[in-house]
């Protein structure tokens, strides 16, 4: 043994050089305790900038040895006559520290965990990987782990080691490409990142992909989180959820962005402080109950660096954003919703992720989470990267994210964003700018397999949860069972209905006669999928105008058109979704940096729209004909679909027991007196709702609450009603 080796605890020069450069691939081979072959052990610790280190007994603090610093600054070593549990007493320039040696502990991740991870079949990644507070050999600490198979070295860095990547290099578990390290005496709330020496020699600081808590943006570090300790009180809701989510049950969704629904304003009237989840629950739950929605849908709440993405460019798929509080606060919010009889759906983004340096992009110096080829892995529309769902570990990562929210947080469903971009390799790409699949086609076979697998696993692991597709193409069978060749979603957003009906309602009434089929065309395919009718955030931003501002005419006509449109929507087959602000007719487009214009509710027209939405929801829930057969063609019957000259539509909705509701819509500002409409039976039909009623700030044209039927056959029916149709109004009636 030469002098250099002897001075440095028996290490060879190449090990010393690797430690000095922070490039040692196997720190456990050189650091920590190593047997000397005679019952004793050599202990080495690499502690750059330490002034002095001694080894002391773990049980009673006896000094066992003073460690010597060799030729490599920061490398301390000592010999112990016998192997025993020990601690390091470290003297720094700013104070002293006593800790167990991270390199004295064995591997912490089990072989089965690593095997399931590599297969992509680990269902609880957030409960085993990332940063897990735990106890090893009676010592409290945190076990860190991260997948980076192509990295040359990975270290845990944070305030606890002055962000020095030389201090805590990790152990590589070769079979799975996972690096791990147990660091004693760390706890919940500690900030950290991974310093990854990539295959390309670049040394970025990466946030933990499996972090369950993060710093508040614009800071980007991960935070150690404990197990969710919330004591759930939503047992009744969870027991009844599958029944509430049946296709024959009402489903009416209030879509909202939690930061701009309500907030605390500063003196300039801008957002001064976001409400915490618990504060939000106190305000939101009574409001949603009063309006009669069955569910809320939150724009993505997974941590995202850029608030202007509205959450649709998330980087922490397991961490609720810290903007509104902790994971415990979020759990309390969901619990409060459930106890108030309100379901909670989350928008979830498995299609793509942003390119931020601290995120998933080229995580270990290679394209790890994304496709390597930009023609497959880069989304030019959003400047984002596309998940490589053909890779086991990535597929397992996304599956575990979905289950994390569904199981740990009792989420009632996920609305999967941008499904069309996942299904097609040529989505929004020109010829020559995409890579065909192995059969030469445009379908993304890996994403399709993932989606089907996701829906199957979710149905088993989270019974009763809804997985909903935002899918804008004519892909067949999106909401059909996978056993029948479908994708297996519970529902699909009906984007075609939304585009057609909004185009129609924006036309001046004098021109609507030429667009008559735009309001009725949706019924041709209404039962090809299980549909949700969405008036979402996307329709009230980017110069598209707010919902009421899309309406033509003067102020009175705009409100009448809006009320008629919403009533038409609620009476149309399909479940309902309405974005916040639309329920009271906000004039401004949605702005994520400002709360809704609640002051408008001092005006009767806005109060009227809000009251109408509440009454529509109550009617929708109370009348079986309006919800039981939303997804069954026998639940709908046209009476008048061809009166383009008068812009009138009329139809019957039927309950499963044969009870009808009549819907009549007049989309011109001209009242129609004595307009005859056939009905199947009933001596007297009562008005359940009139969108032109005075209590909605309408002109109050109607039928004085009820109409007697005449024995005059009409529209193929034996009886008929002579109705007064309100201008720009919709009537909903049923036999008295």
Curated annotation (Swiss-Prot):
UniProt key word Transferase: yes
Pfam families, per database record: Alpha-amylase, Alpha-amylase_C, CBM_48, GlgB_N
Catalytic activity: Transfers a segment of a (1->4)-alpha-D-glucan chain to a primary hydroxy group in a similar glucan chain
Active-site residues annotated for this sequence: 417 (nucleophile), 470 (proton donor)
SMART domains assigned: Aamy
Cellular component terms (Gene Ontology): cytosol
This enzyme's EC code(s): 2.4.1.18
Signal sequence residues: none
GO biological process: one example: glycogen biosynthetic process
Pathway participation: Glycan biosynthesis; glycogen biosynthesis
GO molecular function annotation: 1,4-alpha-glucan branching enzyme activity; cation binding; hydrolase activity, hydrolyzing O-glycosyl compounds
InterPro entries reported in the protein's UniProt record: A-amylase/branching_C (IPR006048), Branching_enzy (IPR037439), GlgB (IPR006407), GlgB_N (IPR054169), GlgB_N_E_set_prok (IPR044143), Glyco_hydro_13_cat_dom (IPR006047), Glyco_hydro_13_N (IPR004193), Glyco_hydro_b (IPR013780)
Transmembrane segments: none
Record family assignment: Belongs to the glycosyl hydrolase 13 family. GlgB subfamily.
Stored HAMAP family: GlgB
NCBIfam families: branching_enzym, PRK05402.1, PRK12313.1
Protein name (record): 1,4-alpha-glucan branching enzyme GlgB
């Amino acid at each position: 043994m030469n002098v250099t080796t002897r001075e440095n605890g028996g290490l060879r020069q190449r090990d010393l050089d690797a430690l000095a450069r922070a490039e040692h691939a196997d720190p456990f081979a050189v650091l920590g305790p190593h047997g000397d072959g005679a019952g004793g052990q050599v202990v080495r610790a690499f502690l750059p900038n330490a002034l002095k280190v001694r080894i002391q007994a773990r049980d009673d603090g006896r000094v066992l040895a003073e460690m010597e610093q060799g030729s490599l600054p920061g490398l301390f070593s000592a010999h112990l006559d016998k192997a025993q549990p020990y601690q390091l007493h470290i003297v720094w320039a700013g104070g002293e520290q006593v800790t167990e040696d991270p390199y004295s502990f064995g591997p912490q991740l089990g072989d089965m965990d690593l095997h399931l991870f590599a297969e992509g079949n680990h269902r609880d990644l957030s409960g085993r990987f990332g940063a897990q507070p735990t106890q090893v050999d009676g010592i409290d600490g945190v076990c860190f782990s991260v997948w980076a198979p192509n990295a040359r070295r990975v270290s845990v860095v944070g305030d606890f080691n002055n962000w020095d990547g030389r201090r805590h290099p990790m152990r590589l578990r070769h079979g799975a490409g996972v690096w791990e390290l147990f660091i004693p005496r760390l706890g919940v709330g500690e900030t950290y990142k991974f310093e990854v020496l990539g295959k390309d020699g670049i040394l970025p600081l990466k946030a933990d992909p499996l972090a369950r808590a993060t710093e508040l943006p614009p800071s980007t570090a991960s935070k150690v989180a404990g197990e969710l300790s919330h004591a759930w009180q939503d047992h009744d809701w969870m027991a009844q959820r599958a029944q509430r989510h049946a296709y024959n049950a009402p489903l009416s969704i209030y879509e909202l962005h939690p930061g701009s629904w309500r907030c605390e304003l500063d003196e300039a009237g801008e957002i001064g402080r976001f409400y915490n989840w618990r504060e939000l629950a106190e305000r939101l739950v009574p409001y949603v109950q009063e309006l009669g929605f069955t569910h809320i849908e939150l724009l993505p709440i997974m941590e995202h660096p850029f608030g202007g993405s509205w959450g649709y460019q998330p980087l922490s798929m397991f961490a609720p954003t810290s903007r509104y509080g902790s994971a415990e606060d979020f759990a309390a919010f969901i619990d409060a919703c459930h106890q108030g009889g309100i379901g909670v759906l989350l928008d979830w983004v498995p299609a793509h992720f942003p390119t931020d340096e601290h995120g998933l992009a080229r995580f270990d110096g290679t394209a790890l989470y994304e496709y390597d080829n930009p023609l497959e892995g880069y989304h030019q529309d959003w400047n984002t990267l596309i998940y490589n769902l053909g890779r086991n570990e990535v597929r397992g990562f996304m599956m575990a994210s979905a289950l994390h929210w569904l199981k740990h947080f009792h989420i009632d469903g996920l609305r999967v964003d941008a499904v069309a971009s996942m299904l097609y390799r040529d989505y929004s790409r020109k010829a020559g700018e995409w890579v065909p699949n192995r059969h030469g086609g445009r379908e993304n076979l890996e994403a399709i397999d993932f989606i089907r697998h996701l829906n199957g696993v979710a149905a088993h692991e989270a019974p009763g949860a809804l997985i909903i597709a935002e899918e804008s193409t004519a892909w067949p069978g999106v909401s059909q069972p996978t056993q029948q060749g479908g994708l297996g979603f519970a529902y699909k957003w009906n984007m075609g209905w939304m585009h057609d009906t909004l185009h129609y309602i924006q036309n001046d009434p004098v021109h609507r006669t030429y667009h008559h089929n735009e309001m009725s065309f949706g019924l041709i395919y209404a039962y090809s999928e299980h549909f949700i009718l969405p008036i979402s955030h996307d329709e009230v931003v980017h110069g598209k105008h707010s919902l009421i501002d899309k309406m033509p005419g003067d102020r009175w006509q705009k409100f009448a058109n809006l009320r008629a449109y919403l009533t038409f929507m609620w009476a149309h087959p399909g479940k309902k979704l309405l974005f916040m602000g639309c329920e009271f007719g906000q004039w401004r487009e949605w702005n994520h940096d400002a709360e809704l214009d609640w002051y408008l509710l001092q005006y009767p027209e806005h109060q009227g729209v809000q009251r109408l939405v509440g009454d529509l929801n109550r009617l929708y829930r109370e009348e079986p004909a309006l919800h039981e057969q939303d997804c069954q063609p026998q639940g709908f019957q046209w009476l008048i679909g061809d009166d383009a000259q008068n812009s009138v539509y009329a139809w019957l909705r039927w309950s499963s027991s044969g009870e009808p509701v009549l819907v009549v819509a007049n989309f011109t500002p001209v009242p129609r007196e004595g307009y005859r409409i056939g009905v199947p039976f009933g001596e007297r039909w009562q008005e359940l709702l009139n969108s032109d009623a005075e209590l909605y700030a309408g002109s109050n044209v109607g039928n004085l609450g009820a109409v007697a039927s005449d024995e005059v056959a009409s529209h193929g029916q034996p009886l008929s009603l002579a109705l007064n149709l309100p201008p720009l109004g919709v009537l909903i009636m049923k036999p008295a």
